Regions:
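ABC ATP-binding cassette signature C-motif
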Residues: 1-251, 302-309
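Short hinge/gating elements
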Residues: 115, 264-266, 298-301
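Intracellular alpha-helical coupling/juxtamembrane segments of multi-pass membrane proteins
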Residues: 237-262, 266-293
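Amphipathic heptad-repeat alpha-helical coiled-coil/stalk segments that mediate oligomerization
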Residues: 287-309
């Protein structure tokens, strides 16, 4: 299980998460939802160890293999096929050890590394990489083309293929369908439905999320809230929660108005003074409910005005 406890995360002076908690269980497939700038990508960076919490604790099982989809790719002379295979770093390490053993003509080490290669399915890795490329819309003629020859959108597809190639217990995908056509999106849905690890996806594609996820983490008002169900279910649950919060707020406001009216009318009367005092204590103990609202999609920051002459 992965857990965030009393987590606070800031970027500069902006508070993204404030004393929030989240538990993610093995094998859960989760959509991460929130307005732009709410902290979704920063949450991913924290899980990857690229950012540290300002307060609180992140707990993750030792040895958890994390894979993620990079958002940029530098021009490279490597072929598309080799780029995707590079996503499996364990394969590349064993491959390098095997080459070294063969150059040294060390029979025992050669046998050892062939055995390790067999354990990770390394002998069919080219076939698996070709399957990923084909599923994401690459033709066989493009497999050997250098990465530098592809446009930005196709390089993002290569990043996605490399992330899927990496053996992982935790897979983080940030807007994976942005540069995919319908056929590639449907293929990706099927691939992710077969994925056995824990999956977190940031996406604005509601249909895609509905077909892949079984949970939603909402990043809202500096908190992480877990909902059970796909995106459509999340929207219904959130609307119901907001309606309940609004009803509770209105009920509390009516009670506050009743207390204030009673105190105003009877505080000066000796026969009612004790009751008025009791109601004032009730008001002091009352935890005021904040108005229910959804985070705005917009964030405005105004500089401090200069002093007038």
């Amino acid at each position: 299980m992965i857990s965030l406890s009393n987590a606070t995360l800031m970027r500069g002076e902006l508070v993204l998460l404030n004393n929030t908690n989240l538990s993610i269980h093995n094998g859960q497939k989760i959509g991460v939802i929130g307005r732009n700038g709410s902290g979704k990508s920063s949450l991913f960076a924290t899980l990857l160890g690229q950012l540290a919490l300002d307060q609180g604790e992140l707990s993750m099982p030792e040895g958890t293999r994390c894979a993620h989809m990079r958002q940029e790719t530098e021009a490279s002379s490597a072929s598309a096929l080799d780029f995707v295979i590079d996503g499996d770093q364990q394969f590349r390490r064993i491959e390098a050890q095997l080459v070294e053993a063969e150059l040294a003509e060390d029979g025992a080490r050669i046998a050892q590394w062939h055995s390790e290669m067999d354990k990770i399915g390394g002998y069919d890795i080219r076939f698996r990489a070709m399957q990923l490329l084909s599923g994401l819309g690459f033709s066989a003629e493009q497999f050997e083309r250098p990465v530098a020859s592809f446009s930005g959108g196709w390089r993002i597809r290569l990043n996605l293929a490399a992330a899927l190639m990496a053996p992982s217990d935790l897979l983080l995908l940030d807007e994976p369908t942005n540069h995919l056509d319908l056929e590639a999106t449907l293929w990706l849905e099927q691939w992710l439905n077969r994925y056995q690890g824990t999956l977190l996806i940031i996406s604005h594609d509601r249909s895609f999320l509905d077909h892949v996820i079984a949970y939603v983490v909402s990043v809202e008002q500096q908190k992480l809230t877990l909902y059970r169900g796909n995106y459509s279910s999340f929207e219904i649950q959130r609307a119901e929660r907001l309606a309940q919060e609004q009803a509770m707020l209105e009920k509390q406001q009516r009670r506050v108005a009743e207390i204030e009216d009673f105190v105003r009318r009877f505080r000066a009367k000796a026969t009612k003074a004790r009751q008025a005092q009791s109601r004032l204590k009730e008001l002091d103990r009352m935890q005021l409910i904040a108005p229910a609202h959804i985070d705005s999609q917009f964030y405005f920051e105004f500089p401090k005005p200069e002093r007038l002459p």
